[in-house]
A protein has these predicted regions:
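Hydrophobic anchor residue at the start of the ABC signature
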Residues: 121-123, 151, 401
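ABC ATPase C-loop
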Residues: 126-127, 405
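The feature captures the beta-strand-to-loop junction immediately N-terminal to the Walker
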Residues: 6-8, 290-292
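Conserved beta-strand-loop-alpha-helix hinge in the C-terminal portion
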Residues: 186-223
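Catalytic Walker B motif of ABC-type/P-loop ATPase nucleotide-binding domains
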Residues: 134-137, 143, 412-415
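ABC ATPase NBD Q-loop/coupling interface
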Residues: 24, 35-50, 313-332
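Conserved ABC ATPase "signature" region
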Residues: 87-105, 366-384, 394, 400-402
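Conserved ABC ATPase signature
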Residues: 109-113, 117, 387-391, 395
Length: 420
């Protein structure tokens, strides 16, 4: 079966998944009430290493689970720990590389991969060990839409054809809810509502498009696919047609250029990530950067921010004059361009939320409480004494966004800002 776990950020989805292989409470601390039994083994008395042959887990941050240097070695590592013979390992490595569409990455260094590529490698490393239960915490959060569909299709095939049990937490429900056999909803009060997806989604506080349509139409259950929704609606000759978009789109720019990029290039050895890009961005506008995993989106953002070595020029209209943030001092550069990276936790290093907020206020030279106020405007309430490492990926992302916005930068760069 494929079980889907849903709930808002911070409701305990990752904690619940952590109980399935003993990470909670053996490594997380806390008190576990009740029992979790996996293949006849009680997770309270069996540590994660004693469950590794039956439960495979891919967390929200794949890099945190890597232990080797290259893709091929990482996929083989888990099988080595389980004592699988070399001949079987070689066969499984090849099969998994093909299944996940990463055969061309086999000899690449893990740290040289994009976030989406790393996510696919992490899933491949777990699948190669052929666990009986696969636990995935937001497995498509860093994947482009095509890659996400490919990965979910592969997982669904394993469920239906091989009998693999998959428990999956996901925010983008429209991608996977049609394939789910059961759904667990975490309202945030510590309880878990279980049932059939179409029944639970009808009352859950997470509302994918089809659930929103269901509520408007007054349907008792939620259609799990567009095809099913169309069947329910049936012919409605009295309904007005949706307005058709005009051929000519009107550009609503701010009129004031804030960013100029001139022949910007980024190269890693013989690999060209960004090739002589020239563009401008106007103040008060939102620019969407799209591309497949590994196409250079993050490289471009880091180059604009100044952390990645690049050629060409980057100019920001800061306080009435044009300057290159790559050549400015740290404080000025932060007020010119701020970047929220894919791995938001990389920017968090203090032991509490309060200290992170206070440090951001100090570095941004703004009144005390500014960062905390921004966090509240993001509708994320975090206890001041909470350690960022104990928070969910989404909560850490919100905290980093508040920290970066505290300096009121001219340009804000967001790399996969909806993870978690």
């Amino acid at each position: 079966d494929l079980t889907l776990v849903v709930g808002r950020t911070g409701t305990g989805k990752s904690t619940l998944l952590g109980t399935l292989n003993g990470i909670v409470p053996h490594f997380s601390g806390g008190r576990l009430d009740g029992t979790v039994t996996v293949a006849g083994r009680d997770t309270r008395t069996h540590r994660p290493r004693e469950l590794a042959d039956v439960v495979g887990v891919v967390g929200q941050n794949p890099v945190a689970g890597f232990v080797t240097d290259t893709v091929e070695d990482e996929i083989a590592y888990g099988m080595e720990q389980l004592g699988i013979s070399p001949s079987v390992m070689r066969k499984r490595v090849e099969e998994t590389l093909d299944l996940m569409g990463i055969a061309d990455l086999r000899r690449r260094a893990l740290l040289s991969l994009s976030g989406g590529q790393q996510q696919r490698v992490a899933i491949a490393a777990v699948l190669a060990a052929q666990p009986r239960i696969l636990v995935l915490d937001e497995p498509t959060s860093a994947l482009d839409p095509t890659a996400a569909q490919d990965v979910l299709a592969s997982i669904t095939t394993l469920v239906h054809d091989v009998g693999l049990t998959v428990i999956l937490a996901e925010h983008r429900l429209e991608r996977v809810m049609h394939a789910a056999d059961a759904l667990w909803w975490l309202p945030g009060d510590g309880s878990v509502v279980q049932g059939r997806p179409e029944e639970v989604l009808a009352r859950a506080d997470v509302v994918p498009p089809l659930a929103a349509l269901s509520r408007v139409m007054g349907w008792p259950t939620v259609p799990l696919s567009v095809r099913e929704a169309r069947r329910r609606v049936g012919p409605r000759p009295g309904l007005p047609r949706a307005p058709q978009p005009s051929e000519a789109m009107t550009w609503h720019g701010g009129g004031d250029e804030v960013l100029r990029v001139e022949t910007l290039g980024v190269n890693y050895g013989q690999v060209c990530a960004v090739d002589a890009l020239t563009t401008t961005v106007e103040r008060g506008t939102i620019t969407c950067l799209m591309g497949r995993n590994g196409s250079g989106k993050s490289s471009l953002m880091w180059a604009i921010q100044g952390a990645t070595k690049s050629s060409g020029r980057v100019l920001v209209n800061h306080e009435g004059s044009w300057a290159d943030p790559r050549k400015a001092d740290a404080a000025t550069a932060r007020r010119m361009v701020s970047l929220v990276p894919q791995s938001a936790s990389d920017l968090l290093y203090l032991p509490t939320v309060a200290e992170e907020c206070a440090q951001a206020d100090k570095e941004s030279e703004v009144p005390a409480g500014t960062t905390r106020a921004i966090l509240s405007r993001l509708r994320v309430e975090l206890p001041e004494d909470r350690n960022p490492r104990d928070m969910s990926e989404g909560q850490r992302l919100a905290l980093v966004l508040a920290v970066q916005l505290s300096s009121r930068p001219d340009v804000v760069l967001l790399d996969e800002p909806t993870r978690g």
